[in-house]
Amino acid sequence: MRKILFGIFLTLNTVLSCIAQQKFEPLPMDPALRYGILDNKLTYYIRHNETEKERADFYIVQNVGAILEEDSQNGLAHFLEHIAFNGTKNYPGKGIINYLETIGVKFGANINAYTSLDETVYNLKAVPTYRSGIVDSCLLILHDWSSFISCEDDEIDKERGVILEEWRTRNTSDRRLWKKSSQILYEGSQYAKRDIIGDTAIILHFHPDSLRAYYKKWYRPDLQGIIIVGDVDVDYVENKIKEIFADIPERVNPATRIVYDLKKLDTTKVCILTDPEAKYTIGNITYRHDAMPSEIYASIVGYTTSVIDNLISKMVNARIDEVLKEKDCPFSYASMSYGSQVKSCDGYELMYVVKDNRCMEASEKILSLAEQVRRYGFTESELYRAKETTIASFEKAYTERTKAKNNSFVGEYKRNFTTFEPIPGIEWEFDAIKKILPSITTDIVNKRFADYFKTNQITVLMTAADKDKNLLPSENQLTQLIADREKIAASPYIDKAKNKPLVKKDPKPGKIVDIYHNPKLDYTMWTLSNGAKVIIKSTKLKNDEILMTAFSEGGISTVGDLSILSSAKIADNIIEANGLGDFDATQLDKALAGKNVTVSPSIAMYESKISGRSTIKDFKTMLQMTYLLQTSARKDPEAYASLMSQYETVLENRSADPMNDYRDSVQVLSSSRNSYTMPFKKENLSEVNEADAIKIFKSLFYCPEKFTYIFVGNLAEDSVKNEILSYIGGIKSSKSKQRGWIDRGIKHPSGFTKCEFSKTLSTPKSADYFSYMTDMEYNLKNKLQLAILRSILDYRYLESCREREGGTYGVAVRQSMSVVPTSSACLKIAFDTDPEKEALLSKIVKEEIDIIIKDGVRDDDFQKAKEALQKSFAESLLENGYWKGQLEHLEKYGWCDNPTYTETLAKITKEDIRQTLKTIVDAGNLLEIKMKPNK
C-alpha cells in the first residue's frame, strides 16, 4: 500500500504544491462546526442548521460493535442496543419512547439505532426544538445511553424473544451466504467469528452479567461521539453537554479498542457456496490492500486519492453499463469499486450477477474489462465526462449548502469519528475540487488503476442456488483464471459518444390559451394550444431544485387485449432501455454527463406518468428529454434483447425465495385473481413483444392534451415560459379517442377469504397477512382518521406482540384509500413469527382490534398519534416534493391536504377513530393469508 500511495504522492506533487512540507497535515475542519473533546475524552460535534425549522437530530456514536465481543458474548453488542430502549437511569422502563412520542417523535421512524461489526449508533431524528427543555431531555437521553443503561434482568429476559424473532426475520439466503463466506474468506480473523445478530443459543441463555460486562467495558466516553445538528443554539448545547456529561468520569486503564486485521493470504482464496433459497448466481473478486493510514486519509493526499478512485469508479462502471446492453453479455449486472472491506483493509471489488449459469464466461468477461483498462488505460473523453459529472455534483452541493438537511451533516461527522474521514465543509471542497480536477490526467488515473492489482491478497466468492451446484466452476478453475488474468484477451476501448444536440430540430412552440392563478396555494396554471395543462409553483425551499411530474389517466387499464398485457406491464422499462431519439441508452448517458437531470416514465394500472428532477441550469435538458419521451421513443433490438435476458435472470430463480410465494398470494388474492394484476413471471417474457410495447407506450404518452405537467421549485414563470412552450407546447396533439381509465374489475374480495399454505423454509417461520376493506368516501377527514388508526395499532402491537409476548420483531400496519375504480379504505396487518406462536399472535392481532371497538381508543395513544401527524405535516411543508404531490392530488381529486389539514386533524375525536375501525371491520371483507413451514 505504501508503494501505491508513494506513487500517487509523486505523481501529484506537481499538481498539489507543498505536500512534502505539510507532512500529511490534516485538512481543516468546517468552521461552521463546533467540535470539542471533554475532559473525560467524550467527543462532540454541534452544528446550527435552520433548513429543518425547529428540528434537530441527536446522535450518540459508539466506536465499538460486534467485533469486540468475546466468544461468550456473541450477539450481545446488538442485544445491548435493544436494551438501551428498555430503561435508563433517568428514563426507566419505556420512558425514552413514551416521552419522545408525546412530542411527535415516533419509535422506528425517528427513534432508532443500529449495530454493525465496528460501530453502534443511536439516533433521535427530527426532534422539535421549540422548547429548550426538549433539547435538555434529548441530551439527557444520550447521557444515559453513554453510561447509564439499566440492563435490568426482567427487561433482558423479555427481549430475548424479540431478538430471536429478529434473527428469524432477517435470516435470509443473502444473510446466510454472507455469514458462511465471512467464515471462509476472513478465516483466522475476528471477522470470521462475528455476524452481529449472534449465536441464538447465547441470546436465549446468557447470564445478564455478561451483557453488563460488555457494556461496562466498551461504552465509555473515549469511544463515544455526540452529534447534534439542527435548529439549536450552539453555545447553549455545548454548555449543556459539558454540564450533563460531567458526571461521567474518564475511564482508568481502559481496554484497548483493537482494530482487527485480516489474516494474510498465502494464495488466492476461493469460496463457492450455495443456498436453497438463493435467487441469483453472483461472483465477487476482491484485490485486498492495507487500509490507508488515518493520517494520510485525513490529509490532502488522502482526499485527492479518493477523488481519483471516484473518477475511476465512474469510468469503469460506465464501460460496464455499455457491456450490459450487449445482447450476449454473460452477466445481468456488474460493478467495480474501490473501498473499505473492514477497518484495516481496503479492496478493489468486481461484482457480477451471472446469466444462464455462464459462470466462467462471466468471470472472464469482468476480468477482461479490468484488463482492458489496465493495459490500454482510459481515454481523454471518458475522463472528461467523469470530471464533468464530479464537478456537477459538487456544484449542486455547494449551491444547496444553505438548504442541506441535518442527516447530510450527521453522516459526515459520524464517519469522521469512526474512520477519520475529513470534514472540511463544502465551501473548502468545492474550491479544492476545482483545483484538483484539472490537474488529474489519464496517466494519473491509469497508474492508480494498475496499482489496484498489485497485490497477492485476492479472494474469489461465488454463490448460487443449491439446484445449480453442479453447474458451478471448481475452486481450481477460478484460481487458475485469476492466475492467468494477464492472458485474457482485451482490446482497446472505442468511445462511441455522439456529439450532437439531444433534439435534432427544435419544435414549433405552442401558445398559452388560458391562464389561471390560485392565490391560496400560490400556483399558476397554463392551458397550452396543444391541450396540455402546465402548473407552475415557485418556491425557495431549495436553491437549485426543480421537480416535475406529468400525468394522464389511463395506464395499463386501457389495454383491452390480454395477449399484449405483458408487453404493457414492462413497456416503460423497454423504452428507457432503448434510449431516446437519435441516442441509444449508452449514448444518452454520455450526452447527459455533467448534468443534474433525471427523467423517467412509468405506467401504473390507472395512469401514465413522467417524473423528473433537475437543477436550474439543466431545466431545459429535462424538458428536452420529456419532449423526446413523448415524440421519439425508439426501437433497438439489441438493447431490447439484453433487457429481456436480464429479466430472465431476475425471474429464473424467483420462486427460490419462499417469501415471493407469500407476496404473490397477497397480490393475487387482494385483487380477486384479476388477470391485470397477476405477478410478472418468467413465462410472461415469451408474451412480450418490442413492437407491441412501443405501440402501447405511444398510445399512452404521445397525447399531450391528456397530460398535466407540474413544475415545483426555484423557477420563475417568465424564465421558463419559452422553453415550456417549445418542448411541452411543441408536442403535437393526438387524435386518440381514448379517455381515462377503464374499470377492469380489480377489487378486494368480498366477505371472508382465507388462504393457508406451507413451504419448505430454511428458517422455520410463519408469515401472516390480514386485509380489511370497506367502501369509504375519499376525503381528508377519513384519510387522517385512517392514519391515526394505523399509529394507534402500531403502539398496541408493539406493546402486546413484541414487548409482552416477544413473539415478533414487529407487526407492520398499513392503511390505504382508493378512488379508482371505487372509493374504498383498506387496513393491512402483517407479521412473521415462530410457527409455535403463530396462533397466539394471530389471536392477539384481532383482539386488539376488538378491544378498540369495544372500549375505545386510549387517550395517550390518541394524543401521540395526532401529535406525530401534525409534526410530520409541518415538516412536509418544507419539501418541494410535498407541494408537487399536493398539486397533483388537487388536479386529480379536486382537493388537497394543505388548506385545512391542521383544522381537520384537531376536530377528529377518539370516537371518530373507534367508529372508523368499526366500519372497516363490520363491512365483513377480510382477507387472511398464512404461510407456514412444511413439517
Question: Where are the predicted features?
Answer:
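M16 family metallopeptidases and their MPP-like homologs
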Residues: Y45-R47, E52-E69, L76-A77, K94-D144, ...
